[in-house]
Amino acid sequence: MGQTGSGKSSLLKLINGLVPHHTGGILSGEITVDGRSTRMHRPRELADLIGIVGQNPAEGFVTDTVEEEIAFGMESLGVPREVMRKRVEETLDLLGLAQLRNRSLSTLSGGEAQRVAIAAVLTMHPKVLLLDEPTSALDPIAAEEVLSILARLVHDLGLTIIIAEHRLERVLQFVDRIIHVLGDENSGQVRIGLPQEIMAQSQSAPPVVLLGKDQVWDPLPLTVRDARRLAEPLREKLANLSPPIRKSAEIKSLPLILEIKKLVVEYEKKVAIKGIDFEVSQGEVVAIMGRNGAGKSSLLGSTVGITPIKSGQVLLDGNPAQELKGKSLISLVGFVPQEATDLLYAESVLQECTFADRDSQVTPGTTYKILNQLLPDITESAHPRDLSEGQRLCLVLAIVLAAAPKLLILDEPTRGLDYSAKLRLIKILRSMANEGRSVVLATHDVELVAEVATRVVFLAEGEKIADGSTLEILTSSPAFAPQISKILAPGKWLTFSEITTALEQN
């Protein structure tokens, strides 16, 4: 764990030899894995021992279909064909991918691609598995399943797994130790300890830990189950209090910024969106949620013309979306896709910001100022490709926000962001909503939704199955409820900040 850009991904790449063999740089000290020195062995010579899944799994795909990709690594290692077939079948079943075996990799959702990448590494039977944000694109149910499977492999087979992760609320219950990569004035240093020891000292922590510290619970809970055992006095204290009411009802009476009517989207004869009707008013923050492959990214892509529409209509501020081009489109809608890196092309952070100011026709320095709000310590001379995934996401967010669009569309906007960066993003999104601008975001980050959304739309297999207030939708969903809701159920609470505010006022 560690803040955005602290070096977590670099640490993983050190372990499998990508640093310095592929990235360059000067390596001092020694790293050995099962007796092999990463200094003396190149990554290909460690491939039978170490498997790695990066932050953007799709970048590592080399074949066309799911089954071919899962088998490819074994082919490279010369695994006999009969053994390959057996391992492929076992892994498809293990990770729930059997129904996707013949799917083209280009048609997978972000979460499906993440599971395929993990499967492709597992079939090679490594002794050490390195995972860089393995649940960032997974829905809560899929994340729980994948992490449970990995934990079982650790306990049953002795597999060693090292995970770099920002969403600690998902992984704390599974880990034996934490390596905290420190930032700021202690940059480059690490602190290693048991989960409770590290969480007790860390400023960044999931809601369950923040609540435990605030209530001085002993022992400090790391899971919802542990917290519920300690929370009865707090539940009694909150029984006669109410969380603040979000302005969803009065917002709905404001003019519409986005209208989607009878929308149908189809890929390779697979219907991704099935006749959805959907509206967004000025000042709304709407979260699109659902399982992996439910159609969230397809819905967002259709609003800006990235996803071809088979039938139906998309209106932006009353205008057909397909008729809007250039500056009129940029000033109206800003879009940050799941793979935000695709939007970066300049040689430095400062150059990206300068180009964005020019393209958006705003005062020079506007984009960099927004970027500094999200990431105060970013280096302006750094090449965008040298940034971490979270830093690149913040750069793209700043570029899009500089144009001050009336509607901001975000696809998984917290991938790679630590808790501090996420809080800064939440502050910006709330500010936009207060100014009457609108936000639509597709995400599996239930804690983000609990903090910022005024409304939640739930998709399943391309259909809208629920549409209501954030409080109503999240507290009624066992799988998608945030940690505070689970701890304090049946009380209707969403966030730690709601609890502290209510207690301070009473």
What do the predicted segments below correspond to?
Residues 16, 304:
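Helix-to-loop junction immediately C-terminal to a conserved catalytic motif
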Residues 82-100, 362-380:
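Conserved ABC ATPase "signature" region
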Residues 104-108, 112, 383-387:
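Conserved ABC ATPase signature
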Residues 165-166, 443-444:
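H-loop/switch region of ABC-family ATPase nucleotide-binding domains
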Residues 171-173, 449-451:
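A short, surface-exposed alpha-helical micro-motif characterized by mixed small hydrophobic
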Residues 199-256, 480-506:
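ABC ATPase nucleotide-binding domains
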